[in-house]
Amino acid sequence: MSATSKPKLYNPRHPERTLLYQMVAEHYETWLELASAGQFDGQGDHHTPKPFVRKAFAKYLECGIFAHGFARARCGDCGHDYFVAFSCKGRGVCPSCTTRRMVETAAHLNDHVFPRLPVRQWVLSVPKRLRYFMQRDGAVLSMVLRIFLRVIAQTLQTHSPGAAHMDKAGLHIGAIAFIHRFGSSLNEHVHFHVCVVDGVFEEVEGEGDADATPRISSPGVIFHAATGIDAATVAPVQTTLQKRILRAFVARGLLENCDAKDMLGYKHSGFSVDAGVCIEAHDRAALERLLRYCARPPFSMDRLRKEGSELVYRCAKQRSEPTSDQRGAKADELHLTPLELIDRIAALVPPP
């Protein structure tokens, strides 16, 4: 530490003072008893909340509380001792730990994973009828993601002029997939955000072609940039995904063949593919913002406030889901009881 720098003081965050912690501490046991009796539908077909959901709430109530454990730290410069409460490191309930995970994940991917090349975000949403199975069956979720990644790879191979005559088996993409289980209004909405290097990597013998532009500096790899990825390109990608995903659901016995054919004919199919966001190679700050967006937690403490006996959650977007709320909620707000808030959060806790 320099002689002129002012030392920073460690201030415990005191989660017990936050509105969310107070609501969970006061109402969680009541919700757990009612949910186990089938009074809430946030847990799907299983009335009793799953063990990982109960564990997430239990850990959250201990996170940052000194009574549940702490570490003693000592400053090597001044010799001052201070205590740091243990954190839960949870992924679904704790706003502090999920925000820290978001920041650390984005920084790591930006600094150590993504090369200095253009990165495009691909987003896939599917109809609610299919989301039901994806939300409850990890194998189905993985199946849809694999199909999505294969179609992205085929699209980039086709639109990378430098790789037009290459063997497709030797061309690969670089991608990080984020599975979102939530929508902007604390609703269940499983969909994918995939950040993909905008082009393909070619495996070559030795050091590769020194004249290739641009080129990754790793031995045996050449990068071929993609061009012409626009709305006209994405439209057939969406059609291809729609056909392949429905065919896969039929093959698994999750859809009848006649239902899949009907869904192919819908004007508004519920399938949506977007690839409009592309970050230039030099704009690392924008890339980190995109990665934070993709790794963000399901809800924000800053959007939650209390009005009388009710909780009001301000949604990031105007709600599209139907509602029977007669409490005067605005289109971009949710009016919830503490039990309803806990139930919504519980439904968004990701499985281990």
What are these regions (language model features)?
Residues 1-352:
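Beta->alpha loop/short-helix hinge microenvironment recognizer with preference
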